[in-house]
Amino acid sequence: MKSSLWVSLAVSLIGLGPAAARNDYPGNYPSSSPPLGPTDWERTPVSVFAKVLNTQPDPDYNLLKELVTYDCTYISLTFDNPTLHGIMPWAGTHTHVGPQAFIDIFTRVGLYWDRGPFSIDHIFGDDGNVTAWGSFTATSRTLGKTVISPWAARARVNSANQIFEFQWMEDTFTTASSFGSDNSTKVFIANPEGGTAHA
């Protein structure tokens, strides 16, 4: 009795009337779909690729486990270059390492450089083959040298919309120079007609 009295009082205070019976509404009105949340997005090879590229500054292991196969191969900067690997230890082919390769590389890059602006200028795909390129700015944490480099990346995506092969390229001559001492120079002999270049 007291319960119904309180309900009646609350209804009168907020201006609600009794609910109409279901049969009082003509037609069939299905409930609307729930609003899209941050984890609700249409998965396509291109959108998966973009998600992985954009998680570089703050690697999300759970997201990467979801979007990268356990045996994915990551080719970073070069197939195999011991000199480059000595400067940037993540350079080389990481065969069948899976999401852990992404975590290790993305994290280590952040330890070596202070990341600046990163842009995806173009991205597109042909079924499971996707590619993108853009530019980024980075400042070496050891010497404080800032460089701007173009980058390009390619991925192969399976029918489950998971990346199983990933390749990243950049202007390594420029990015490696951010770790070069001003007191060190290297002589390059490239022109067949003679002459040298110093860097």
From Swiss-Prot:
Disruption phenotype: Completely abolishes the production of patulin, shows reduced sporulation, and leads to the production of a distinct dark-red pigment. Residues 1-21 form the signal peptide. It is found in: Cytoplasm, Cytosol. Patulin was originally used as an antibiotic and specifically trialed to be used against the common cold, but it is no longer used for that purpose since it has been shown to induce immunological, neurological and gastrointestinal effects. Genotoxic effects of patulin with dose-dependent increase in DNA strand breaks in brain, liver and kidneys have been detected in mice. However, more recently, it has been proposed that patulin might also have anti-tumor properties. Pathway: Mycotoxin biosynthesis; patulin biosynthesis. Keywords: Cytoplasm, Glycoprotein, Oxidoreductase, Signal. This is Patulin biosynthesis cluster protein F. It comes from Penicillium expansum (Blue mold rot fungus). The lineage of its organism: Eukaryota, Fungi, Dikarya, Ascomycota, Pezizomycotina.
